[in-house]
A protein has these predicted regions:
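Exposed, low-structure sequence patches enriched in small/polar residues
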Residues: 1-304
Length: 304
């Protein structure tokens, strides 16, 4: 620690070895994975934290398999035994400020993965071959802002989170960019033994290679009652909407697709919850010391 600056350095070693049955060729690789964290405290109300790490990603056994699988009369899935492990570089920056009932958190990150193993589709005669290869690179820029206020009158708390993910996927035979905006809102109200909770979030989508994997857009409303060790509640998913969907897309030039999965039954789907806290053995009451001669709290708050 240097004045208000805390730092942490780490390093690890990874060994990857692969040998396919019936094949004399094998693959072995070592990688050094460093990690660093810097944390600067401006005051009791704010700090700035920077993190960076390098780690190794290895191909899965299914991707390495040379076996061909027939999907249908036009498509074949084929593994690639020549896949190589690759390095991943990630850095992120977080700024946090809080004062009284107000709290804010601003976060940004950048991911860079050269030679990333990603999907691709090739045309061979009258067939479409789906396989994997070490592509040029995959990059992701992310940003997120969280605002929270509460508790107001010791009863109400509100929070809002908005963010964006920008993907850049560069293959050997393709190049795609995709931007996904998302938000999440929460509200909770507590009065005596009752509590009311509401949450809404939009789709958080992921893009890798040529494939878009969609997240969920969902709302939830629930009310709970607590009496001693008993807690009971009733709630509903999507109580005000019926537009739940999960999308999936592939942007390949030979065999693209776009699907949207709708579940109308998720609209106004009710749930009931009961829980009881059982306690066994002795129970002890603890009191906080008024004077603490040591200070081990770095005021680190981890948000994922």
């Amino acid at each position: 620690k240097i004045n208000k600056l805390d730092y942490r350095l780490g390093i690890s070693l990874t060994r990857f070895y692969y040998n396919q049955s019936g094949n004399d060729d094998s693959s072995k690789k070592y990688s050094v994975n460093p990690k660093a964290t810097l944390h600067y405290t401006f005051s009791d109300n704010s700090y700035l934290r920077w993190k960076a790490e390098v780690f190794n990603a290895t191909p899965s056994l299914s991707d390495l398999s040379a076996i061909e699988q027939t999907i249908d009369s036009f498509q074949i899935r084929r593994g690639n035994p020549n896949l190589k492990s690759y390095m991943c570089y990630r850095t992120e920056l977080t700024y946090e400020w809080k004062k009284g009932i107000f709290y804010s958190n601003l976060w940004g990150a950048y991911d860079y993965r050269p030679n990333a193993i990603m999907d691709e589709k090739l045309q061979e005669d009258n067939k479409i071959v789906q396989t994997w290869d070490n592509q040029k690179d995959w990059q992701k820029l992310s940003g997120r802002l969280m605002l929270r206020v509460g508790p107001l009158w010791d009863m109400l708390q509100l929070s809002f989170t908005g963010g964006v993910n920008h993907y850049m996927s560069h293959g050997n035979n393709y190049s795609h960019t995709y931007t996904n905006w998302y938000y999440e809102g929460q509200a909770s109200f507590n009065y005596k033994r009752f509590s009311l909770f509401w949450q809404i979030n939009t789709n958080w989508n992921n893009f890798w290679g040529e494939t878009l994997s969609g997240g969920e857009n969902i709302q939830m409303l629930a009310v709970y009652y607590k009496h001693k060790n008993l807690r009971a509640g009733v709630g509903a998913f999507n109580p005000f909407t019926d537009n739940y969907k999960v999308q999936s897309e592939n942007w390949n030039k030979f065999a693209s697709y776009k699907t949207n999965n709708y579940i109308k039954e998720s609209s106004r789907m009710f749930l009931v919850n009961f829980s009881y806290n059982f306690s066994f053995g002795r129970s002890f009451k603890t009191a906080q010391r008024k004077v603490n001669n040591s200070d081990n709290d770095l005021s680190l708050i981890h948000i994922s």
